[in-house]
Amino acid sequence: MEHGDRHITVVDEQGNEQLCEILFTFESDDFGKSYVFYYPVSAEAEDEDGETEVHVSAFIPGDENEEGELLPIETEEEWDMIEEVWNTFCAEQEEGEE
């Protein structure tokens, strides 16, 4: 994972690079980890309904000249916490649109 201001380059298991935009990051004191919500910048990332799939990973930030590292979500408890954060984010976005 390479960091830009609001973009990261994600490398998949096949070695393909994909430019993604960071939606937001947060830290969890309960799990002692940082998390990032991101989505692919390319138009091909949209599904048949025109929706863009958002991904989430734990991450270890890199130093100034080093790449960071994306990590998988490991437990059901982490997924529950992430879902709660996502639902709060979506509710706040909807309130802002009204």
Curated annotation (Swiss-Prot):
InterPro entries (UniProt xref): UPF0473
Domain of life: Bacteria
Protein family membership: Belongs to the UPF0473 family.
Database matches in NCBIfam families: PRK13678.1-4 (NF010217), PRK13678.2-4 (NF010221)
Family annotation (PANTHER family): UPF0473 PROTEIN CBO2561/CLC_2432 (PTHR40066), UPF0473 PROTEIN CBO2561_CLC_2432 (PTHR40066:SF1)
Protein name: UPF0473 protein GTNG_2486
